[in-house]
């Protein structure tokens, strides 16, 4: 069965990913035919955003099982599982998707296993879109009429199964006519804000103004921002949140200026196994991502570089976490546990 979204197309016998490294100047779709290609696409930023990474990994494992045919079993798939799990260590949705597939597949083998994995990967894809649409409505309820919001990185349809997390809230608020506009930080070093978020919002007709990351404090000081809305790659049991590098800076600035700081993420991004943010593994990426921009060197060749892909925002700085199940106000361990318990009951 074909399942399509803005950046991910499942065609039954292969996967197509929109190469987000080429946007906004070029639209290029890449064919993904096995787990190694899926892992490479995740690692090399062809696809990014925690939900989209989880969806891609699920399809990648299903493809590997198809290739194995009658030899497919959870034991023979372990190398593929390890390869996919190693592709981006911070995004918990990746591990969640692989663990879910294992539970769903059970003791199946051969073609029955391959079919089951494909079915559940499709379900993960569809469920993410529905979750984002619900999240958008819950999050829009938190915004005042006429708000202008600030967002960081890209959390839209390109980063998910559709609609988006933080950008989904923005889309839903715009549909309600309660949003005035959006400031999008450029998000160095990969420029997801300038290349992807501005592209998505402009295509939707939502007023967006692109700014340098270092402009956020001035905008808040001038009273031009009524809320900051970001996504998440992992949220620990106490509400500490890993997200794109620069998110922590925004949370500190928002608290200083008494501006709501809202995190949007599906329940699959919550990781109750980790008590707090100090336990999150932070991915460090290649130094040349900072030294160079689109292949052009902007720094001395041998200058040392520190390039973490994510930072940790303490729960104390977060006004609310929005999931598809509702809103966790001023998150802490007890509130996160209660939210997860309600999710299990429903």
Swiss-Prot record:
Substrate binds at residues 48-50, 88, 192, 243-244. The active site is at 233 (proton donor). Pathway: Amino-acid biosynthesis; L-methionine biosynthesis via salvage pathway; L-methionine from S-methyl-5-thio-alpha-D-ribose 1-phosphate: step 1/6. The record marks 153 as: Transition state stabilizer. SUPFAM superfamilies: NagB/RpiA/CoA transferase-like (SSF100950). It catalyses: 5-(methylsulfanyl)-alpha-D-ribose 1-phosphate = 5-(methylsulfanyl)-D-ribulose 1-phosphate. GO terms for molecular function: S-methyl-5-thioribose-1-phosphate isomerase activity. The keyword tRNA-binding does not apply. The gene is mtnA. Belongs to the eIF-2B alpha/beta/delta subunits family. MtnA subfamily. This is Methylthioribose-1-phosphate isomerase. The keyword NAD does not apply. Keywords: Amino-acid biosynthesis, Isomerase, Methionine biosynthesis. GO terms for biological process: L-methionine salvage from methylthioadenosine. Gene3D superfamilies: translation initiation factor eif-2b, domain 1 (1.20.120.420), Translation initiation factor eif-2b, domain 2 (3.40.50.10470). Catalyzes the interconversion of methylthioribose-1-phosphate (MTR-1-P) into methylthioribulose-1-phosphate (MTRu-1-P). Its EC number is 5.3.1.23. It comes from Alcanivorax borkumensis (strain ATCC 700651 / DSM 11573 / NCIMB 13689 / SK2).
């Amino acid at each position: 069965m074909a399942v399509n979204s803005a950046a991910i197309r499942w065609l039954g016998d292969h996967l197509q990913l929109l190469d987000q490294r080429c946007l906004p100047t070029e639209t290029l779709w890449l064919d993904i035919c096995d787990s190694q290609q899926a892992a490479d696409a995740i690692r090399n930023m062809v696809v990014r955003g925690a939900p989209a990474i989880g969806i891609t990994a699920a399809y990648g494992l299903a493809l590997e099982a198809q290739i194995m045919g009658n030899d497919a079993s959870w034991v023979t798939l372990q190398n593929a599982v390890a390869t996919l799990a190693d592709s981006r260590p911070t995004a918990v949705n990746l591990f969640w998707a692989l663990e879910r597939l294992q539970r769903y597949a059970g003791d199946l083998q051969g073609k029955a296993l391959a079919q089951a994995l494909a079915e559940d990967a499709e379900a993960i894809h569809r469920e993410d879109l529905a979750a984002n649409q619900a999240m958008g409505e819950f999050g829009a309820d938190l915004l005042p009429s006429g708000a202008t919001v600030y967002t960081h990185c890209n959390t839209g349809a390109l980063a998910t199964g559709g609609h988006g997390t933080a950008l989904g809230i923005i889309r839903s608020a715009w549909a309600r006519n309660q949003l005035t506009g959006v400031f999008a930080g450029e998000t160095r070093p990969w420029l997801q804000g300038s290349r992807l978020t501005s592209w998505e919002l402009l295509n939707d007709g939502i007023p967006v103004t692109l700014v340098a990351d270092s402009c956020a404090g001035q905008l808040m000081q001038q009273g031009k921002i009524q809320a900051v809305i970001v996504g998440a790659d992992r949220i620990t049991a106490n509400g500490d949140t890993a997200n794109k590098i620069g998110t922590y800076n925004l949370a500190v600035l928002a608290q200083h200026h008494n501006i709501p700081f809202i995190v949007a993420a599906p329940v699959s991004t919550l990781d109750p196994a980790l008590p707090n943010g100090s336990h999150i593994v932070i991915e460090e990426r290649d130094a040349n991502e900072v030294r160079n921009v689109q292949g052009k060197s902007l720094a001395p060749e041998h200058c040392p570089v520190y390039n973490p892909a994510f930072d940790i925002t303490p729960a104390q700085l977060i006004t609310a976490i929005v999931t598809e199940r509702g809103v966790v106000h001023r998150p802490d361990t007890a509130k996160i546990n209660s939210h997860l318990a309600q999710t299990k009951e429903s």
